[in-house]
């Protein structure tokens, strides 16, 4: 098939500018890497592989800040997913990915294929996916029917894909803020389990070994999806639907089972395996060849296609879903085909490993590409980004701290429970199957989801956490607080934190203020990860999250996994028994910058969040976890949005109990402070002495669990006495009422 343009026409008309490749990069490719003009197919491959989504050319210097090694880390960043040792020859495998741009444009398919892609990353490692989590960030729902529609479709996409494939969704988080009105965020996380001996890699090596394409056929959906994800939106972004992929969860289920059968039962046939994700065939094949220090030759006429007359450019850049690329030992091609045939899936040899390190493509009898493979994967032109500290942060450093003023603590609590970010998210989670496979111990709605590991006493805990408001106000402190939030959630479940994955969601990195925020927040994340011994083992970067120049808050999502060695000590979020003692873990300060109460009362956020004492928090959380493993803690709940008052209320929702709390030395405003690193725990009276001796000054006894459904809080300058049922009604009805609104 004739190329769409000659190399000379490409140089003159510059179509690559529409694919996020700059003129400087084009000249560098021509003059330094190829020493000739690239043809249409080749420049298409460069534009995809050099996109930020694939190359991380802007963010690589920042990613180097992260600690990636640890005594339990088996595989860090660089493969399909991170792998962490959980003893007994087993590992937990996990990764998070963003699908923000596709979900904003086409919410159902964008969300569904976001889930599908992250599943393939995990099972390509040889792990069976056991849980899905999602971190969803929407604009304001009130008076915004478009956002309500996008939310419904996003949730439906996540639920349909996960439910059809039979993997439980163990929760995550949902937040609402006007900064996401033009660019919603969908971050999906998958957790899998495997025996370490079964781990696979994405590599192609061994002269003459075959490159096999398996799974669904290739169509024209998702072409230039990677470059679409590496540019901001315009008012015309609805026309970009063709860059959104279409998923088939039933095909994914078959593909997963076939791949796992091959990996677990016939690993001697397999050299390497990788998902065809962003940038489709070119990304998976070029990365596998690079990893194996090999060359690769592909015949695109052999690629299974569901649409006629596809060009080499279209075949290589299609992001059709449910496809994998294998490197198979020569002589075992028919064996592999038989496995996939049993699942009614295509399995076709489309190429081979060759001498040298060139990447060669043939289409319709012509050589359409012959370039050094590393020019696509490693020779990406990195350009230093400009950075500048935003003026609003400089100004905030000179301003006095904001503190709320109000009459009634009870009324403020009711208003906070009605805020969508705080309100019960059952409207969302009830659309997900959280119990399939019968291993779920703690369902969505708690601080962390908990899943038992069959045939052992172990369990894994998992959570996702984001708070863009804190990161916006002070990126470094906000990054630290994001990690603290995840650590608290994992510890609250009874688990020891192991490692994290991340999704770094930011605006245009060419804006010096945004790039400064990216670097500073990642430094904060790195600092906290070192203190809490939670290395970064996987993740992704999603930049250009803005619409018509309006960027989202810098929103790094932390996905954390922890280990529970004995399921007898899984800790519930809700109080369990009347007369148990209630403790506040961690010190409370007047920390209101970026808080829910500030946004609710001011209509905006401002000021500087307090810097946490990372070492202090690490030490007392370590002691709290020790108390849990000794059976001293009955329940635990993290303090986050809304502060102490909200967490106290949540700990008695869906129970028969109430709380009698004495905070006579607390100013009423402190009920709503969001000081990080705090939890409320309940302890049986007979365990009081042992618990206090372990935690010391880090805990304060604040009250008792009662058998009456009343929340009573005595303060220095107020008293809150409220029926729990009325609070729970507000909390549960907020989101459903907004979704039913006609406005």
Curated annotation (Swiss-Prot):
The lineage of its organism: Bacteria, Bacillati, Bacillota, Bacilli, Lactobacillales. It is found in: Cytoplasm. CDD domains: PurL_repeat1 (cd02203), PurL_repeat2 (cd02204). GO terms for biological process: 'de novo' IMP biosynthetic process. The active site is at 53, 99 (proton acceptor). It comes from Lactobacillus helveticus (strain DPC 4571). Mg(2+) 2 binds at residues 121, 275. This is Phosphoribosylformylglycinamidine synthase subunit PurL. Keywords: ATP-binding, Cytoplasm, Ligase, Magnesium, Metal-binding, Nucleotide-binding, Purine biosynthesis. Monomer. Part of the FGAM synthase complex composed of 1 PurL, 1 PurQ and 2 PurS subunits. Substrate binds at residues 98-101, 120, 245, 319-321, 542. It catalyses: N(2)-formyl-N(1)-(5-phospho-beta-D-ribosyl)glycinamide + L-glutamine + ATP + H2O = 2-formamido-N(1)-(5-O-phospho-beta-D-ribosyl)acetamidine + L-glutamate + ADP + phosphate + H(+). Part of the phosphoribosylformylglycinamidine synthase complex involved in the purines biosynthetic pathway. Catalyzes the ATP-dependent conversion of formylglycinamide ribonucleotide (FGAR) and glutamine to yield formylglycinamidine ribonucleotide (FGAM) and glutamate. The FGAM synthase complex is composed of three subunits. PurQ produces an ammonia molecule by converting glutamine to glutamate. PurL transfers the ammonia molecule to FGAR to form FGAM in an ATP-dependent manner. SUPFAM superfamilies: FGAM synthase PurL, linker domain, PurM C-terminal domain-like, PurM N-terminal domain-like.
